[in-house]
């Protein structure tokens, strides 16, 4: 029979592991929430890209129809029509590819939520998400740190449990036997007589070098858990700072596009169309200008997605 200290130590290990299982579940929920947010942002991004590609497809289709008409009238050559057809075909292929990517993201969203319902994102205006208050003295994600702290508690409890195995044990026993024949007292005993005896002893571990080695190994596990906590904290702080710096860089680009870039792209697009239809520029100049205008709008949408991804990462690192 072990002393209560031994059983209490074993119970503590089980209780700490039990607590850790709930923290693991909370971590999975936390990670799932971030993944859903990233996929949802991706779907909104695809919607915005689709609008831009449809706009480009419409303009390139008009250009193709005009080039085809000019060719029939002998006002242009085959190269202009081929260029127009190529631009229109590229826009169509990009739309089809985008739709496939969007279907994959929709399936991923439904898979992550996993409640048997098919989900899609709302067709809302695409803009920058809300960023929670920034804290220069970021101290790490509470949920992740709790789990790392709990790992330390488990290893501490296991060390105490291994040490408890060196504690003495109580040995209790009862013997019951029969004897047939003459006993030491020269009396005759038949098989119906039973003789009982008992013993009480204390077991003290003497050859315990193996267990002491186990204890030393557990001390190493204890140090590993402590190091993992410190490394986890450093990693969280580095992630936060990296995402914050990338967000600030992207936010500067977004400001440029919103204040200047988008207005310039619309101005280029409008002016290029007017000059081309009035015969002031040729189709090569028009193609260059229109492509440049759409590239500005395309980059703006890309930067919006990247900025929102960083906001999701930053908010997630601060939330539980």
Regions found by a protein language model. Give the residues of each.
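A small-residue-enriched
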Residues: 1-3, 139-213, 238, 316
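Sec/SRP-type N-terminal targeting helices
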Residues: 2-32, 54, 79, 83, ...
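Residues at alpha-helix boundaries and short interhelical turns
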Residues: 5-8, 47, 71, 75, ...
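Outer-membrane beta-barrel translocator domains and adjoining extracellular loop/strand segments
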Residues: 9, 122-124, 182-188, 217
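Charged, solvent-exposed faces of alpha-helical coiled-coils
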Residues: 10, 17, 21-24, 35, ...
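Short segments within alpha-helical structural elements
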Residues: 90-115, 264-320
């Amino acid at each position: 029979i072990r002393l209560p200290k031994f059983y209490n130590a074993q119970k503590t290990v089980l209780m700490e592991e039990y607590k850790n299982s709930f923290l693991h579940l909370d971590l999975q929920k936390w990670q799932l929430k971030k993944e859903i947010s990233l996929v949802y942002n991706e779907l909104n991004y695809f919607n915005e890209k689709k609008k831009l590609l449809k706009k480009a497809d419409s303009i390139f289709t008009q250009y193709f129809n005009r080039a085809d008409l000019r060719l029939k009238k002998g006002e242009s050559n085959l190269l202009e029509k081929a260029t127009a057809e190529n631009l229109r075909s590229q826009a169509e292929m990009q739309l089809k590819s985008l739709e496939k990517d969007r279907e994959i993201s929709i399936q991923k969203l439904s898979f992550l939520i996993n409640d048997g319902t098919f989900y899609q994102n709302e067709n809302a205006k695409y803009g920058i998400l809300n960023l929670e208050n920034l804290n220069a003295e970021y101290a790490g994600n509470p949920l992740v740190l709790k789990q790392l702290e709990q790992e330390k508690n488990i290893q501490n409890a296991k060390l105490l449990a291994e040490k408890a195995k060196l504690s003495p044990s109580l040995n209790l026993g009862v013997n019951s036997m029969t004897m047939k024949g003459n006993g030491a007292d020269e009396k005759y005993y038949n098989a119906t007589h039973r003789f009982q005896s008992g013993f009480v002893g204390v077991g003290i571990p003497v050859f315990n070098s193996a267990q002491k080695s186990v204890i030393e190994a557990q001390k190493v596990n204890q140090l590993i858990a402590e190091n993992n906590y410190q490394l986890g904290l450093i990693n969280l702080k580095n992630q936060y700072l990296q995402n914050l710096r990338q967000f600030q860089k992207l936010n500067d680009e977004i400001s440029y596009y919103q204040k200047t870039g988008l207005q310039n792209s619309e101005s280029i697009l409008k002016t290029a169309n007017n000059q081309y239809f009035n015969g002031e520029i040729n189709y090569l100049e028009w193609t260059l200008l229109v492509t440049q205008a759409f590239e500005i709008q395309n980059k703006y949408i890309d930067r919006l997605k990247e900025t929102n991804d960083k906001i999701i990462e930053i908010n997630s690192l601060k939330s539980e």
